[in-house]
Design a protein with these regions (language model features):
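Glycine-rich beta-alpha loop elements in corrinoid/cobalamin-binding modules
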Residues: 1-129, 135-140
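Conserved SAM/AdoMet-binding glycine-rich loop
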Residues: 8, 215-321
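C-terminal, active-site-flanking charged/polar segments
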Residues: 36-38, 61, 76-77, 205-226
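Conserved, mostly hydrophobic/aromatic
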Residues: 43, 150, 184, 188, ...
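Acidic/polar loop patches that form or flank catalytic/metal-binding clefts of enzymes
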Residues: 47, 67-72, 158-162, 199-203, ...
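N-terminal [4Fe-4S]-dependent radical SAM core
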Residues: 107-177
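N-terminal pre-triad scaffold of radical SAM enzymes
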Residues: 166-192, 223-225
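Iron-sulfur (Fe-S) cluster-binding segments and ferredoxin-like electron-carrier domains
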Residues: 191-208
């Protein structure tokens, strides 16, 4: 594409590019690969959930803004020749060093994961070849109004037209599912959700979710059964820290391990109210919870953690399985 249209900026994004934004292990070739920006030749990389980044980026392109201004847009990555001159950037181990030293690679992974879970992360820079890859900080967590605006767009909920007439097993599993929020503060070592969505929960309003569920009735083949009302972790909807200032200083990747954070509000009240409203939507026979559940959000060694814990577990077992 760049050979045909060398002056057209190429932007890559999505979870595949997002998780390859710095040095990473490639299973197929059993080797460490540099940032996907280097191998792909793309000009820009939008990582994480990219609505705000792409809106800002397209506005900047349309307005003819200076590339130096574009390089300040949050959640954008790019490759530059030479050495980084930013004084406040965190410099990672180079790609070449990571290839020679597995400890250096582990250090990079730890740094990237730590800052992916912070509200105010710095710029990350990874030297590679004769230049460097710069990864800008994330946006602040999306507000409820922003989350609603993302989901209230007129999506068809259908596969790309190129797959017309073909059976797609993955689509069958999710075509009648509904997403309630983004992010996960579980911090499981095997999971990369936080590297893509962050650990801070960003929830939609009940009204937005109910609008989507009501619209399911118009989809061909819908028989009243929702396969999943969930997210990375289904029962984190509406949860957040009691004191935002403490969250802003936090460097923990998990709010639950090795023990639940005392600043975390684990009430399931909002989720119970949402389930109650879903049950009243005309045409809905059953709303399953297909996403994962964190039992340590409502149970500990002493039993149920608050007065919403038992009602939630009862509702989950009797109505959503």
């Amino acid at each position: 594409l760049k050979e045909i249209y060398p002056d057209i900026p190429v932007v890559i994004g999505g979870i595949e590019a997002s998780l390859r934004r710095v040095t990473h292990y490639d299973y197929w070739q059993d080797s460490l690969k540099p940032s996907i920006l280097v191998d792909s030749g793309a000009d820009w990389l939008c990582y994480g959930m990219g609505e705000r980044t792409m809106i800002e980026f397209t506005k900047a392109i349309e307005a003819g803004r200076n590339p130096s201004d574009i390089r300040k847009i949050p959640q954008l990555g790019f490759y530059m020749d030479g050495k980084c001159r930013l004084k406040d950037a965190v410099i990672l181990n180079s790609y070449e060093r990571c290839c020679k030293d597995k400890v250096a690679f582990a250090e990079n992974f730890h740094v990237v994961e730590t800052y992916a879970n912070m509200l105010q992360p710095p710029v990350l820079v990874e030297p590679v070849g004769k230049g460097y890859v710069q990864i800008n900080p994330t946006w602040p967590p999306a507000t409820q109004e922003e989350m609603d605006s993302f989901w209230d767009l007129p999506y068809t909920k259908l596969p790309h037209p190129r797959y017309k007439g073909k059976h797609i097993p993955a689509f069958e599993m999710i075509k009648f599912s509904v997403n309630t929020h983004r992010g996960c503060f579980g911090g499981c070592n095997f999971c990369t959700i936080a590297a893509h969505q962050g650990k801070f929960i960003q929830s939609r309003s009940e009204e937005s979710i109910i609008r989507e569920i009501t619209a399911l009735n118009k989809l061909p083949g819908f028989a009243g059964n929702i396969s999943d009302v969930g997210a990375p972790t289904a029962n984190m909807y509406g949860m957040k820290g009691k004191d935002p200032e403490l969250c802003a200083k936090c460097r923990r990747k998990s709010c639950l391990f090795p023990g639940p954070c005392r600043n975390m509000d684990r009430s399931h009240e909002r989720l119970l109210k949402l389930y109650e409203r879903i049950a009243k939507v005309k045409g809905i026979r059953h709303a399953y919870i297909g996403s994962g559940i964190r039992y340590d959000l409502f149970l500990d060694e002493k039993g149920f953690v608050d007065d919403t814990s038992y009602p939630y577990l009862k509702e989950l077992i009797l109505e959503h399985t």
